[in-house]
Amino acid sequence: MSKNKLSKGQQRRVSANHDRRLKQRADKPEPDDNLFGEVRDGVAISRFGMHADVEDADGSVHRCNIRRTIRSLVTGDRVRWRPGVEGGATVKGIVEAVHERTSVLTRPDFYDGVKPIAANINQIVIVSAILPELSLNIIDRYLVASETLNVEPLLVLNKTDLLDDEGREFVDEQMEIYRHIGYRVLMVSSHKKEGLRELEEALIGRVSIFAGQSGVGKSSLLNALLGLELGDEEILTKDVSDVSGLGQHTTTAARLYHFPHGGDVIDSPGVREFGLWHLEPEQITRGFVEFRDYLGGCKFRDCKHDTDPGCAIREAVDKGEIDASRFVNYHHILESMSEVQAKTRRSFSADKE
């Protein structure tokens, strides 16, 4: 996702941090090339500082150093790497290069502007639930992120076992808003394991992330799909400590897991709760897919799509061609973005002083 233009002060901060990291890396000697074998392809399944866990084609995982020339490497990156020669290198391998990404998930970062956190994702599973509450506003936020990334979204409503007939009818009406504009919706229960087979099929052949507000059961759902009988947070430490003994670093590091039925998932707290703060208003507008046919049809080129005279989108809402709740959420998102961006600017200014 693209970012807002940084102020000169922010640009200086980003540049200074990058230069500092380059100097730190330059102070450390590169490993001897003779200690490593032939170059091969792999996937970065997690990263810890200047090391990455790289999975080879045979499924084996290798803790690798990262060349200083590599500016950015995140979970999901396809890489070129070399294994350590047995009895020679003190590390299992070294990452030489990163292949071009098909997509990259980012989040705002106070020091570096925008920070990549996962790469090559092709599906965002947007998880919601009737508890703590069904929030269409949050669903719409994640849909905007998906559309901006050009990554296919999948809407999953969890905890459906808690619905009575009346509640199920209400929820189905709400979900019809999204089905009507072309989104796929699945109703599941991780507790009762209902609807999981259909969800498993939707994950095959995909690199997915699971996103949604706290309390909707993302971790429980992932554990059920991965075949784990673990607590909500233990997914973030399983396998990493088994592979490298570095489980203490995994609570914030994104990691790629394989579903037993096929498909992959990249998971971490940062991945689950990425935001929209670094988007432009025009990107938010285009992120509402049903608005697109009306863009360019407004009377004024700088139309805010609110109370402006001759607004084609507003007229479509009045005619029932665009759902009114989506239109309201669109403006809520714009307002909240403005508030967050203003707060961020104040933080930068205060820090500068």
Swiss-Prot record:
It comes from the Bacteria. Zn(2+) binds at residues 298, 303, 305, 311. It is found in: Cytoplasm. Residues 1-14 have a biased composition (Polar residues). Binds 1 zinc ion per subunit. Residues 16-31 have a biased composition (Basic and acidic residues). This is Small ribosomal subunit biogenesis GTPase RsgA. It comes from Erwinia tasmaniensis (strain DSM 17950 / CFBP 7177 / CIP 109463 / NCPPB 4357 / Et1/99). The lineage of its organism: Bacteria, Pseudomonadati, Pseudomonadota, Gammaproteobacteria, Enterobacterales.
